Amino acid sequence: MKKIAVDAMGGDNAPQALVEGVNRAVQEFSDIEILLYGDEAKIKPYLTAGERVRIIHTEEKIDSDDEPTKAIRQKKEASMVLAAKAVKAGEADAMLSAGNTGALLAAGFFIVGRIKNIDRPGLLSTMPTVGGQGFDMLDLGANAENTAHHLHQYATLGSFYAENVRGIKKPRVGLLNNGTESSKGDPLRKEAYELLSGDSTLNFIGNVEARDLMDDVADVVVADGFTGNAVLKSIEGTAISIMGQLKKSILGGGFKAKLGAWLLKDSLRGLKNSLDYSSAGGAVLFGLKAPVVKTHGSSDAKAVYSTIRQIRTMLETDVVGKSVIEFSDAKE
């Protein structure tokens, strides 16, 4: 049985979205057990799953405006902290939260702990592409600054994730840069390029540009945390803007526009689904001793369900265990 600790009080739509997502996941997957950490009185009205769900009551929670490290240290009974402690103690195999990202990173680093020889765990998420396959990108903001060595480790971690969780054989690894030529980039990117191209265990395809990311140019894209977070926000914002503009044009375009939209409804639905990052799950703080996954703060029940499904796959394929073995002896 795979045990997943859920911070039921984190996020904009907590606890309703978290609990409703849990209801669906428990109904669909018979091999998971959920530990819900939070205010029992607020959780129970939404809980329909009677089996394999246990509520661990606490009224303390970490707010979105709390200082991350301070909150983790001072709010020892917060739902997020208790979920992380359950993972560390072996009472749960993984944890999920839609709460304060910085606090979750701190809980992952200081409570769950890093895999030996991984210097900086990175935040990894599967991003949408036009072709529908998507690509895994890290780091998406766990670290503001990185070295070339960190980027090399991210390439290995990303390859492990793409191959084991998403089933991609020999995933293509690209280094995000301001040009595709090997001579492009600042000293960080140039040094990282040398490390990646010299690693025969990676299917490194070279530099990739941001404009090509959604065209299935690579399966894994490596970036420093600052750049990766900026790209993530750009992709999210662009997807929302495109769908918003389409809706505005259809509603304001009169009868012909509405008729055209009706005729194209299947195609438009496909476009919407291809840009929906929530269906892929959450962002994994990869490089820790157990899966710690952050779902978007505004996640609905569907996104929470998708994240639980993602965690289940991570546990089923033992991607973290394989990463531990890979890094048990430092490669560099």
Swiss-Prot record:
The keyword Iron does not apply. One of its GO terms (molecular function) is phosphate:acyl-[acyl carrier protein] acyltransferase activity. Pfam families: FA_synthesis. Its EC number is 2.3.1.274. One of its GO terms (biological process) is phospholipid biosynthetic process. It is found in: Cytoplasm. Gene3D superfamilies: Isopropylmalate Dehydrogenase (3.40.718.10). GO terms for cellular component: cytoplasm. Keywords: Cytoplasm, Lipid biosynthesis, Lipid metabolism, Phospholipid biosynthesis, Phospholipid metabolism, Transferase. It catalyses: a fatty acyl-[ACP] + phosphate = an acyl phosphate + holo-[ACP]. Catalyzes the reversible formation of acyl-phosphate (acyl-PO(4)) from acyl-[acyl-carrier-protein] (acyl-ACP). This enzyme utilizes acyl-ACP as fatty acyl donor, but not acyl-CoA. PANTHER family: FATTY ACID/PHOSPHOLIPID SYNTHESIS PROTEIN PLSX, PHOSPHATE ACYLTRANSFERASE. Belongs to the PlsX family. Homodimer. Probably interacts with PlsY. This is Phosphate acyltransferase.
